[in-house]
Amino acid sequence: MAAAMATATKCMSLNPSPPKLQNQTKSKPFISLPTPPKPNVSLAVTSTALAGAVFSSLSYSEPALAIQQIAQLAAANASSDNRGLALLLPIVPAIAWVLYNILQPAINQVNKMRESKGIVVGLGIGGGLAASGLLTPPPEAYAAAEAAAASSDSRGQLLLIVVTPALLWVLYNILQPALNQINKMRSGD
């Protein structure tokens, strides 16, 4: 929704004047009305301020409400829930494909860093972040994960039934290029 609002405000700021007709004849009014004074602020500034107000109001929403609802679901049903696993299974091939495509550029980057001694700097920054605790998730994330794992309903499985045909279609479209790439790698071209 925020993206749609931002697009709308951007579109309004790109074309501030209405389109003019080519063969427009001017008519003289019977009564002359005074023209209102023009505002000093341009439309681009106004639309930017409007977008800022909308986004700031969206950013102040209460995130604790979702965690509280998950905790209530967890308290109501004490059996285990497999929704996370059911949703993860169809996504694993897509993630593996993305990682496969990222692997070679990542290896190239590491080799460039080794040549320029940049890996020492990268490890130093990573070690500093890990030592300061910036890489660990907050305890609230663990509580939300535990609450989600404790609740039990079959909505995840129903979602899986709906999503499965789309994921199968994506996998079908990925399969032939993947086989072509494997054959190219085997032939050594």
Curated annotation (Swiss-Prot):
Signal peptide interval: none
Lumenal side, ranges: 75-83, 139-157
Record's subcellular location: Plastid, Chloroplast thylakoid membrane
Biological process according to GO: cell redox homeostasis; photoinhibition; photosynthesis
Skewed-composition ranges (Polar residues): 10-24
Gene Ontology, cellular component aspect: chloroplast stromal thylakoid; chloroplast thylakoid membrane; photosystem II
Region Disordered: start-end pairs: 1-24
Domain of life: Eukaryota
Protein topology in the membrane: Multi-pass membrane protein
Spans within the Stromal topological domain: 105-117, 179-189
Main location: plastid
Transit peptide: 1-74
Keyword line: Chloroplast, Manganese, Membrane, Photosynthesis, Photosystem II, Plastid, Repeat, Thylakoid, Transit peptide, Transmembrane, Transmembrane helix
Single GO term (MF): manganese ion binding
Transmembrane segments annotated in the record for this chain: 84-104, 118-138, 158-178
Prodomain residues: 118-143
Further comment found in the protein's record: The central hydrophobic segment (residues 118-138) does not form a membrane-spanning region but could serve as a targeting signal for processing of the precursor in the thylakoid membrane.
The family this protein is said to belong to: Belongs to the PsbY family.
Function: Loosely associated component of the core of photosystem II (PSII), it is not always seen in crystals. PSII is a light-driven water plastoquinone oxidoreductase, using light energy to abstract electrons from H(2)O, generating a proton gradient subsequently used for ATP formation.
The name this protein goes by in its record: Photosystem II reaction center proteins PsbY, chloroplastic
Name of encoding gene: PSBY
